[in-house]
Amino acid sequence: YGNVRIFTGSYSSPNMNFRVTTLGTVHQPNQPAFLVRDSNSSSAFGANAYADFDTVILNRGNHYNTSNGRFTAPIAGTYLFISLMLSNGSNRLFHEIRLNGSQVAGTRTESGTGAGQYQSNTTQAILELAKGDWVAIHVGSGGAYGGSYSNFSGYLLG
């Protein structure tokens, strides 16, 4: 322990750029991150389709594409993705996080019978991505409400 040196200053490489303060706080100003949701809370995402979240809350680096619902990794690294979806009334909901079109995580919710029986579910995944890999949310069955009831986020861990 006597030979431990505290690094302060800046570090850059092709895959990361960060600064460490004398207090030990790490700042990554260009770290890819996004949070998106749908613009219409009364609309629903259909079954067997990718969710195309069209309202951007945060899109650092502009790597989330609202036209196709995909986040494309600008650099290789470990990323965290989280999706929260609200079921469409009395329908069940199955939604997946997909990497390059293949399921890597998923959640299924059975709603109650009758109108107004909504359930929410959350799916998350920590993924090792190569530059150019894409991640999107696929609604497998049932349907999901949009608006602030359903969202998708992700960011580079390192």
Spans of features found by a protein language model:
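Extracellular jelly-roll beta-sandwich "head" domains, especially the C-terminal globular C1q domain
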Residues: G2-G158
